[in-house]
Amino acid sequence: MSAQASKPVPVETQHEDMIHDAQLDYYGKRLATCSSDRTIRIFNVIKGEAKGEPVILKGHTAAVWQVSWAHPSFGSILASCSYDGRVFIWKEVGQGQGKGSGGELQDGWERIKEHTLHTASVNSIAWAPYDLGPILACASSDGKVSVLSFQNDGSIEVNIFPAHGTGANAISWAPSVLSTVSGVSRSQQPSNSLAPQKRFVTAGSDNLIRIWGFDEEQKKWTEEETIKGHEDWVRDVAWAPNIGLPGMYIASASQDRTVLIHSRPSPSSSWTSAPLLPSLPQSQDPHFPDAVWRVSWSLAGNVLAVSCGDGKVSLWKEGVGKGWECVSDFSS
């Protein structure tokens, strides 16, 4: 099966070093990029193209690895994480406004919060599904994960715990689903027994991915699953949205040149893992040409983008009874 991806549109970012991340906001009207040049740049996107001069945000003292937009219901807010071990929260406040504790106003953006509890590079950040509230999860080379819950009074509740002994490289939230009493269907339960579950997956330098859930009674994060399968560092992990789809899917990308799809058809079943096959299917070779750095799902959760160290991006879909198939690829 084949499919045509739209032609890539280049963006002249004016970054002075390697670009590590690029993220569109919820509406697709703004593009944020970050780089080893220690800056973040924000572009307006008009008809699919970045227009005008970017806003340049400075403050990190080392490479900026990732940026992440909050849901617009919380305002125009962007988080960034860096090799300097810090996480910044930026807010658009408009020219001539802003008086938070974070620092000076930069082109209408203000650094309103700074998270400094990690002792090594913060490699990945992710905002929770919006119905869980303004919650940011962070994964660090110090082996710990921190979860920042922003309160209405402006304070931050921080929960930090060890996740991967040799370093946490990536983090991704599960889609928001309602918790249910075991053995009772959702339709049979009173409405007050339902609450959105907090759950995410992490990837580590211990070659593992781990699934964590929040225990509402004990008010702490607990490990629910450990999934093996990779033979080297797991560079990225992505939990698929499940809009109209049965079951759950998690994709993981590794230094071992493989991508694994971990699936669970129902809450009562076990996780199973299967590799993508970038070579001819009959060869059954799961290895990409180089280390795989990023995986990202489409909004509907039915297409997976894979970014490889050879500079190519491939798009994958699950075929009917045929496993996962590459439907398009292009050079980045």
UniProtKB/Swiss-Prot annotation:
Top-level division of the source organism's lineage: Eukaryota
GO molecular function, one term: structural molecule activity
Chief localization: membrane
Protein's UniProt keywords contain Transmembrane: no
Cell wall biogenesis/degradation keyword on record: no
A Pfam family of this chain: WD40
Protein topology in the membrane: Peripheral membrane protein
GO CC terms, sorted: COPII vesicle coat; endoplasmic reticulum membrane; nuclear pore outer ring
Alphabetical keyword list: Cytoplasmic vesicle, Endoplasmic reticulum, ER-Golgi transport, Membrane, mRNA transport, Nuclear pore complex, Nucleus, Protein transport, Repeat, Translocation, Transport, WD repeat
GO BP, one annotated term: COPII-coated vesicle budding
Cellular localization per UniProt: Cytoplasmic vesicle, COPII-coated vesicle membrane; Endoplasmic reticulum membrane; Nucleus, Nuclear pore complex
WD repeats (start-end): 14-53, 59-100, 117-158, 163-222, 229-272, 287-326
Disulphide connectivity of cysteines: none
Annotated PANTHER family: NUCLEAR PORE COMPLEX PROTEIN SEC13 / SEH1 FAMILY MEMBER (PTHR11024), PROTEIN SEC13 HOMOLOG (PTHR11024:SF2)
Function: Component of the coat protein complex II (COPII) which promotes the formation of transport vesicles from the endoplasmic reticulum (ER). The coat has two main functions, the physical deformation of the endoplasmic reticulum membrane into vesicles and the selection of cargo molecules. It also functions as a component of the nuclear pore complex (NPC). NPC components, collectively referred to as nucleoporins (NUPs), can play the role of both NPC structural components and of docking or interaction partners for transiently associated nuclear transport factors.
Quaternary structure note: The COPII coat is composed of at least 5 proteins: the SEC23/24 complex, the SEC13/31 complex, and the protein SAR1. Component of the nuclear pore complex (NPC). NPC constitutes the exclusive means of nucleocytoplasmic transport. NPCs allow the passive diffusion of ions and small molecules and the active, nuclear transport receptor-mediated bidirectional transport of macromolecules such as proteins, RNAs, ribonucleoparticles (RNPs), and ribosomal subunits across the nuclear envelope. Due to its 8-fold rotational symmetry, all subunits are present with 8 copies or multiples thereof.
Family note: Belongs to the WD repeat SEC13 family.
Name the record gives this protein: Protein transport protein SEC13
Organism taxonomic ancestry: Eukaryota, Fungi, Dikarya, Basidiomycota, Agaricomycotina
Gene: SEC13
